[in-house]
Amino acid sequence: MAKRDYYEVLGCDRGADETVLKASFRKLAMKWHPDKNPGDPEAEIRFKEISEAYEVLKDPQKRGAYDRYGHAAFENGGGPGGAGFNADFASTFADIFDDLFGGSMGRSGARSAGGRARGADLRYNMDITLEEAFSGKTAQISIPTSISCEVCSGSGAKAGTQPKTCRTCNGAGKIRHAQGFFTLERTCPSCQGRGTVIEDPCPNCGGAGRVTRERTLQVQIPAGVEDGTRIRLGGEGEAGVRGGPPGDLYIFLSIEPHTFFQREGADLYCRAPISMVTAALGGTVEVPTIGGEKTKVKIPEGTQSGKRLRLPGAGMPVLRSRSFGDMYVQVVVETPQNLTKRQKELLAEFEGLSSTDTHPESNGFFAKMKDFFQGASSDND
C-alpha cells in the first residue's frame, strides 16, 4: 500500500510551522496511541504513521528532502527512523505519555528514590483592616496541616519493621514498557513510584507517614502591604512524604474597605464637608489621619467644592521603605438647608451685592449662554 503524504497524515498544509506541526502531532498521537486503544490494530498502524510523519517534518533537513523528493528521499536505507528520534522528539512524546497514564520517558518525577516527595504548599486567606496595613501587625493563625508522624518518624512502617522492596518493579519505582522503536516508563502501580511497600503499617498514621494536626503560627504582617499581597513562609506547608522536604505556606492578604479613606497605592483619599462661609472666607477643618491622630487642614479663601488639598507624607507607608504616600482631602461645600427668614434675607441681600468678581464662574457661564443663543438667533435670520 502506497504511503500517504506526511502533511496529509498530520492534517497540516505544506506551509505549517513547527508549532502547528507539533500541536497536530500531539492531538493525533493522543487519539491513536495503542494504550488508549488496546487491541485495535488500526490504532497501532495510525500511531506509527503519525510518529513517522512528525519525525520527518519536525526536522528541517529531512523536511526539505521530503518536500523535494517525497518518500523517495528515504528509500534505500535512508528511512526516517534511527537517529532522527532526538531529545526534542522524546520530550514531545513524554508530554503525551504523562497525559495518557501519568508516566514518563526516563524523566525524573517529583518523587525520589525511596518515595520521598516534597509536601504540598498551603494557602491561607487573611483579612486585615487598613489601619493594620498602615502599622503592620503580628497575627496568630491556626491551620490544619499534615505533619510527619511522630510514631514512625515519617517512614509509614510499624515500629521495629522497615518498608520492603517492591517486587513488581524491584525497587525502581517504574515499569518499562516496549512500544515500537522506543521504550516507555510508567509509575509502578504497586508502590506508586516509591520503590518500596509497607507490609506492616504504622498504627498511628496507617502507613501514610503523615498525620493531620492543627498548628498555630505567628505571622508578621509588614507595614505598607497592599490588597492581594502574598507572604511566603518557607517550610510551613504540609510535611513531605517519606521524609521529603515540607512545602511552603502562602498567606494571601485582603484589606477590608474603609469607611472614611480610599487607597490608591500609597496615597489616601477622603472627603471633608465645609460650610459656604468657610469656603468663601477661608479657615480650617479638622480631619482624622490613618494613624489615629487628627490634623487641621487649611482652607484657602474662595475654595470651590471638589477641590483637593494635599497633605504630604500623611498617606500609607511604602512597603520595605522609609517613605510615605500623601493624603488628599477633597472639599465638599455644603449648601445650607432649613434657613430662617433672616438668613434668607441676608443671602438675598448678598446676592444683590454680588458682581462678576465674586462669582467669576457663574458670570462666565451665563455670558457663554448669552453668546450661544444670540449666535443661534443670527443663524435663523
Swiss-Prot record:
Record-level GO cellular component terms: cytoplasm
Annotated cofactor note: Binds 2 Zn(2+) ions per monomer.
ZnF start-end (CR-type): 136-214
Protein residues bound to Zn(2+) 1: 149, 152, 202, 205
Main location, first listed in the record: cytoplasm
Quaternary structure annotation from Swiss-Prot or TrEMBL: Homodimer.
Protein name (Swiss-Prot/TrEMBL): Chaperone protein DnaJ
Species, as recorded: Azorhizobium caulinodans (strain ATCC 43989 / DSM 5975 / JCM 20966 / LMG 6465 / NBRC 14845 / NCIMB 13405 / ORS 571)
Gene name tied to this protein: dnaJ
